[in-house]
């Protein structure tokens, strides 16, 4: 993995590909250092996801897809005939799937790349013609279509590696367009919410007040974000709005990432302590809560960053809409409910230590440092996610439509 200082590069997009190489921000170094990492192989991709240099369900999915394509390319380069071995794709996927078990996008993206390769293997064995269509129904390029009817192991390996990489690139592009579409849906939801507020006596001159948790912004996706996509688009149209940003302990992704990217975009915002949201709602200072998610279960339960459930409870108590912005790929109809999700338990060090800049007046080189914030030996419990019951969710804002979480099975029937 290569590190590159890129202090002048725009923050968006979060991931880009140049000459076959994958680049993204090292999010563990933000907001104090803006550094790019180059993911050169499948191990780099797995390490970046596990270490949270790459985080956010959609971005994890994109990097996992690219990592799976790299793993396929690497395996075929080493042993061109390995595709004949039973379960070879499952073996290659294991390292990536083990990195972040809660995010359904990861497994979905890996499965998409694997399926594109399996489609070729099923349609083009040693004794059959190569396929003339890929999974999306598009005709494959001439160089692939004109291969011999009985391809060699080397030519088949090249074909499979090319197909895996192309499918991964398609998924990257799809994430970008998907989030833009979520933004359009979110605009309609938020503006309707604002009109309702104004109809009930709120002044039209007051900015639309949105509270968000963790980081479901552009940094959590290839571009735009999920929860922030509509915020970016409304801001670009000159709509007055203000965002309350939860700090989101213990990794402080709201304070260090969401606030950072909103500042970069010039969007008015205020960072608040995680426990301040309820008071703001009580005082009428929140018009809507907007979050992303790592998974939506078949019964409409939402799995998201720890602390989301408490925001949903407070919003329900004060009659404030609680929206979840997510791509359809985050909806897992194979998972019955939130109670069936494996919740990732993270290191106790995330609770006992905190990263920041020293503020000593004589400090000349202000480099980020880690400090202990509790007595050594304290027992810590650090679940990365919690479960928000479907009944607390006003709606799921996907790229296709606004969905009632209690009617999710009907929507996907």
Model-identified regions with their sequence ranges:
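Conserved phosphate- and dinucleotide-binding cores of soluble alpha/beta proteins
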Residues: 237-241, 246-413
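Positively charged, low-complexity intrinsically disordered leader regions
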Residues: 2-43
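Basic polycationic patches enriched in arginine
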Residues: 139, 145-147, 206
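Short, hydrophobic/aliphatic alpha-helical segments
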Residues: 37-53, 87, 207-212, 363-379
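N-terminal active-site beta-alpha-beta segment that forms phosphate/nucleotide-binding
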Residues: 51-123, 154-272
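Acidic-glycine-rich active-site phosphate/pyrophosphate-binding loop
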Residues: 33-44, 158-162, 206, 258, ...
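Short, glycine-rich nucleotide/cofactor-binding loops
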Residues: 36-42, 215-221, 298-304
């Amino acid at each position: 993995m290569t590190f590159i200082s890129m202090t002048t590069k725009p923050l968006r997009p979060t991931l880009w590909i140049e000459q076959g190489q994958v680049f993204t921000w090292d999010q563990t170094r933000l907001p104090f250092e803006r550094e790019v990492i180059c993911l050169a192989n499948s191990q780099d991709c797995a390490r970046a996801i596990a270490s949270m240099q790459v985080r956010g369900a959609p971005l994890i999915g994109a990097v996992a897809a690219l990592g799976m394509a790299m793993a396929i390319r690497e395996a075929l380069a080493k042993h061109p005939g390995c595709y004949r071995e039973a379960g070879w794709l499952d073996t290659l996927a294991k390292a990536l799937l083990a990195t972040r078990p809660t995010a359904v996008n990861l497994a979905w993206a890996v499965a998409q790349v694997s399926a594109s390769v399996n489609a070729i293997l099923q349609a083009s064995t040693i004794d059959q013609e190569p396929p003339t269509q890929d999974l999306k129904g598009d005709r494959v390029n001439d160089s692939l279509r004109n291969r011999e009817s009985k391809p060699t192991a080397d030519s088949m390996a090249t074909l499979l590696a090319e197909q895996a990489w192309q499918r991964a690139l398609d998924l990257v592009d799809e994430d970008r367009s998907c989030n833009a579409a979520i933004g359009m849906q979110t605009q309609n939801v938020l503006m309707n919410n604002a009109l309702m507020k104004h109809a009930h006596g709120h002044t039209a001159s007051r900015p639309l007040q949105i509270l968000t948790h963790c980081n479901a912004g552009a940094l959590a996706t290839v571009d735009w974000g999920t929860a922030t996509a509509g915020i970016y688009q409304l801001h670009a149209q000159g709509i007055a709005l203000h965002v309350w940003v939860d700090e989101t302990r213990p990794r402080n992704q709201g304070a260090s990432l969401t606030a950072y990217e909103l500042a970069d975009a010039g969007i008015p915002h205020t960072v608040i302590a995680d426990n301040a949201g309820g008071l703001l709602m009580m005082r009428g200072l929140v018009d809507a809560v907007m979050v992303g998610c790592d998974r939506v279960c078949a019964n409409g339960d939402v799995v998201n960053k720890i602390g989301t459930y408490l925001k949903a409870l407070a919003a329900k108590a004060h009659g404030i809409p609680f929206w979840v912005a997510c791509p359809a790929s985050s909806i897992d109809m194979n998972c019955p409910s939130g109670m069936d999700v494996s919740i990732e338990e993270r290191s106790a060090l995330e609770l006992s230590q905190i990263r920041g800049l020293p503020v000593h007046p004589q400090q000349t080189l202000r480099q980020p440092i880690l400090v202990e914030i509790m007595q050594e030996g304290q027992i810590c419990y650090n679940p990365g996610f919690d479960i928000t019951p479907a009944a607390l969710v006003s709606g799921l804002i996907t790229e296709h439509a606004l969905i009632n979480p209690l009617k999710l099975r009907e929507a996907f029937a």
